[in-house]
């Protein structure tokens, strides 16, 4: 495995072919999870350390289940109660874990770019479970897997991502995956929550920017709603919540305008009644719980690949 492929920091680390291979492997892992005994010995003898410096439910538990289903030894690391609280640096912590025999580190960190620092000091494989506003590659992979399972392929899909684009690491990783696999992507939201369009089109030239959701619905194959990340916002970026919901919220009325084959997605956690209404989140069009379920198989596939 090349140095670049030794770690999974974002989907720009992978070619379109490699992404497709991960999705194909996830199909096999999904079959494993359908068995009475949901376990294979693929990572027996390997140690996976989950380092989460930021709160998580879906991603953390999903990675734990994925590693255990592959028969790995799983260690849950939290900053609280560790030497990090005594001032130990991130690099020294990683070196300690390496000395203790960690083969794979799964890391979530609030600081964008932190995985790149860790990767320079870890001889094993590093998987980014989300870093600041930068990237969340496994969320993008499970989103791609879910889209493909419903539509057969990613190429030529019309994908609308609506909400807090500016602060979303999910958007950035999805853009790498979706554009590499040939989807047509539109980012939609208030100008203050998208930022300069040139920021996006300079890296992803085929991406469209829109500020009005309603005209996009009739031709959408996928609509992905994003929560408002108020914890990352500066004052003044967000209009009144009621006004935001009126213009950008996925309401039952907007759901009715989607094509019959369209699916509604959300990476979670949801703010119901703001970016998505409960009636939409629980509708037959929504595949939100399916995304969560698919996350285990997709993360199994990536762990298996990174284990070499």
Curated annotation (Swiss-Prot):
L-aspartate binds at residues 86, 169, 227. GO terms for molecular function: amino acid binding; aspartate carbamoyltransferase activity. Gene3D superfamilies: Aspartate/ornithine carbamoyltransferase (3.40.50.1370). InterPro entries: Asp/Orn_carbamoyltranf_P-bd, Asp/Orn_carbamoylTrfase, Asp/Orn_carbamoylTrfase_sf, Asp_carbamoyltransf, Asp_carbamoyltransf_Asp/Orn-bd. Pathway: Pyrimidine metabolism; UMP biosynthesis via de novo pathway; (S)-dihydroorotate from bicarbonate: step 2/3. One of its GO terms (cellular component) is cytosol. Carbamoyl phosphate binds at residues 58-59, 108, 136, 139, 268-269. It catalyses: carbamoyl phosphate + L-aspartate = N-carbamoyl-L-aspartate + phosphate + H(+). Catalyzes the condensation of carbamoyl phosphate and aspartate to form carbamoyl aspartate and inorganic phosphate, the committed step in the de novo pyrimidine nucleotide biosynthesis pathway. Heterododecamer (2C3:3R2) of six catalytic PyrB chains organized as two trimers (C3), and six regulatory PyrI chains organized as three dimers (R2). NCBIfam families: asp_carb_tr, PRK00856.1. Belongs to the aspartate/ornithine carbamoyltransferase superfamily. ATCase family. This is Aspartate carbamoyltransferase catalytic subunit. It comes from Chloroflexus aggregans (strain MD-66 / DSM 9485). The lineage of its organism: Bacteria, Bacillati, Chloroflexota, Chloroflexia, Chloroflexales.
């Amino acid at each position: 495995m090349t140095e670049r492929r030794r770690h999974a920091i974002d989907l720009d680390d992978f070619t379109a072919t490699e992404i497709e291979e991960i999705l194909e492997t996830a199909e096999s892992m999904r079959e494993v999870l359908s068995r009475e005994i949901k376990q294979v010995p693929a990572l027996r003898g390997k140690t996976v350390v989950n380092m989460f410096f930021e709160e998580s439910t879906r991603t953390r538990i999903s990675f734990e289940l994925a590693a255990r289903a592959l028969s790995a030894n799983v260690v849950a690391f939290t900053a609280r109660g560790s030497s990090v609280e005594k001032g130990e640096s991130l690099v020294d912590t990683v070196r300690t874990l390496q000395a203790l025999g960690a083969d794979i580190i799964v890391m979530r960190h609030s600081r964008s770019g932190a995985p790149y620092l860790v990767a320079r000091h870890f001889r094993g494989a590093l998987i980014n479970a989300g870093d600041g506003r930068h990237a969340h590659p496994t969320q993008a992979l499970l989103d791609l897997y879910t889209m493909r399972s419903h539509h057969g392929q990613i190429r030529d899909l019309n994908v609308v991502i609506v909400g807090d684009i500016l602060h979303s690491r999910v958007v950035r990783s999805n853009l790498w995956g979706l554009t590499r696999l040939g989807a047509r992507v539109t980012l939609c939201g208030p100008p203050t929550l998208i930022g300069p369009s040139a920021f996006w089109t300079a890296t992803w030239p085929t991406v469209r920017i829109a500020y009005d959701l309603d005209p996009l619905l009739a031709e959408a194959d996928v609509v992905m709603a994003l929560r408002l990340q108020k914890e990352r916002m500066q004052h003044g970026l967000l209009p009144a919540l009621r006004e935001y919901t009126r213009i950008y919220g996925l309401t039952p009325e907007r759901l009715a305008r989607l094509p019959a084959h369209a699916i509604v997605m959300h990476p979670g956690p949801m703010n119901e009644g703001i970016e998505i209404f409960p009636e939409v989140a629980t509708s037959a069009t929504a595949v939100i719980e399916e995304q969560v379920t698919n996350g285990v198989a997709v993360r199994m596939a990536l762990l298996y690949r990174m284990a070499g």
